[in-house]
């Protein structure tokens, strides 16, 4: 319902837009969105590594990083973790992780993060190792220090409201300037899998502000693309760097949305006759799967519609594998064999066509995006020098 409402708001705003001006590349708002999916985050990590490599090649700069090119980077669950890794600064004020470092991170830490607690009550995993490694990697860094705008979602089970961590919200809501490791654990704390996360910050008056958070997928149902777009829209309205965007104009939005894979056989898994025999527990598990699958599809459909309505379909690229099988469909199978399979999925995906109606592969589309991102960065730098 929340996703549908968000789309309708965006859609009618677009219909009300009458601007027909050509897009200025230097003033395009660039957005990267990364889905949730646990260990399946290896798939978008492969895509990010390829894209960052292309940017380094195009700009002849081995130190080029994704955060240098995107105005907004958003993620939920494992996508929130990836967002933090590529936007959190090191001691040199550069991203502490290059895209090529992400897959090794999963291989090193995944088996310890998804190490069954053995408890018959409570979550499947105690989350202690996950929180520990996040503290070690992200340190005391807070939201305001991120190298570009971020949009990381979570859900507060005490207030029963989504919580969105962004730099642009801090002036009005300074209590959202939380430590990145707290945010990353919270957005990954999927019900059933990990315990909820409690931490405190302070308001502008110095009062204690409490958070009781679970997985951001509860708020965005796994795909944060609409959230990332809404943050980008606000950025375009408030930042003088985007002064040519007088109204919501998707000709000046460039969106790359990365999925963690879905199971194409999901629709064939159940029949009405089988489901008629299910009890409440079986329905709970199935509904969670159905909701995630349907939401991912509908979010992509909604966004495709709004970009096409503005004749800007080439400004949106959704990279998603829809044919996961076997263990690769599991968000918590961190065995080395399965992680190797996920790497293969990501590498194979690059060679696949973007759609059945287009001969362009994801690899070719990402190369096109890399050139756009590079040219926009150069034009913006030239404009700033005058």
Curated annotation (Swiss-Prot):
A motif (DGA/G) lies at residues 215-217. InterPro entries: Acyl_Trfase/lysoPLipase, PNPLA_dom. Keywords: Coiled coil, Glycoprotein, Hydrolase, Lipid degradation, Lipid metabolism, Plant defense, Signal, Storage protein, Vacuole. The active site is at residues 77, 215. It is an enzyme of class 3 (hydrolase). A motif (GXSXG) lies at residues 75-79. A motif (GXGXXG) lies at residues 36-41. GO terms for biological process: defense response; lipid catabolic process. GO terms for molecular function: monoacylglycerol lipase activity; nutrient reservoir activity; phospholipase activity. GO terms for cellular component: vacuole. Residues 321-384 form a coiled coil. Glycans are attached at residue 115. It holds the Pfam family Patatin. Residues 1-23 form the signal peptide. Its EC number is 3.1.1.-. It is found in: Vacuole. Its main location: other. Tuber. Residues 32-229 form the PNPLA domain. Patatin have a dual role as a somatic storage protein and as an enzyme involved in host resistance. The nitrogen atoms of the two glycine residues in the GGXR motif define the oxyanion hole, and stabilize the oxyanion that forms during the nucleophilic attack by the catalytic serine during substrate cleavage. Belongs to the patatin family. Probable lipolytic acyl hydrolase (LAH), an activity which is thought to be involved in the response of tubers to pathogens. This is Patatin-10. It comes from Solanum tuberosum. The lineage of its organism: Eukaryota, Viridiplantae, Streptophyta, Embryophyta, Tracheophyta.
């Amino acid at each position: 319902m929340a996703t549908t409402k968000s789309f309708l708001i965006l859609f009618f705003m677009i219909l009300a837009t009458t601007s027909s001006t050509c897009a200025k590349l230097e003033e395009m708002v660039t957005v990267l969105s990364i889905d949730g999916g646990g260990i399946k985050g290896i798939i978008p990590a492969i895509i990010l590594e390829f894209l960052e490599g292309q940017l380094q090649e195009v700009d002849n700069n081995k130190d080029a990083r994704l955060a240098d090119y995107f105005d907004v980077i958003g993620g939920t669950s494992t996508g929130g973790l990836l967002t933090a890794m590529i936007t959190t600064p090191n001691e040199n004020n550069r991203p502490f992780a290059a895209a090529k470092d992400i897959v090794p991170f999963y291989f090193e830490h995944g088996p310890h993060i998804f190490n069954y607690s053995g408890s018959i009550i409570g979550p499947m995993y105690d989350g202690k190792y996950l929180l520990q490694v996040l503290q070690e990697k992200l340190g005391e860094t807070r939201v305001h220090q991120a190298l570009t705008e971020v949009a990381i979602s979570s859900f507060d089970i005490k207030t029963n409201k989504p919580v969105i961590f962004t730099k642009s919200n801090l002036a009005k809501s300074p209590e959202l300037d939380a430590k990145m490791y707290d945010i990353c654990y919270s957005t990954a704390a999927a019900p059933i899998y990990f315990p909820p996360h409690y931490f405190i910050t302070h308001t502008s008056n110095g009062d204690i502000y409490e958070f009781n958070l679970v997985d951001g997928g509860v708020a965005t149902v796994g795909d944060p693309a609409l959230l990332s777009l809404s943050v980008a829209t606000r950025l375009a309205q408030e930042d003088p760097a985007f002064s040519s965007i007088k109204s919501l104009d998707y000709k000046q939005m460039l969106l790359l949305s990365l999925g963690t894979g879905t199971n194409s056989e999901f629709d064939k898994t159940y029949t009405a006759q089988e489901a008629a025999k299910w009890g409440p527990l079986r329905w709970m598990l199935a509904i969670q799967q159905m909701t995630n699958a349907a939401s991912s599809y509908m979010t992509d459909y909604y966004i495709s519609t709004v970009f096409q309505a503005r004749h800007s379909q080439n400004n949106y690229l959704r990279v998603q594998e829809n044919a996961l099988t076997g263990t690769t469909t599991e968000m918590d199978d961190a065995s080395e064999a399965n992680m190797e399979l996920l790497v293969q999925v990501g590498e194979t995906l690059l060679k696949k066509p973007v759609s059945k109606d287009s001969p362009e592969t994801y690899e070719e589309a990402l190369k096109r995006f890399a050139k756009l991102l590079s040219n926009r960065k150069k034009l913006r730098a030239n404009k700033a020098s005058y």
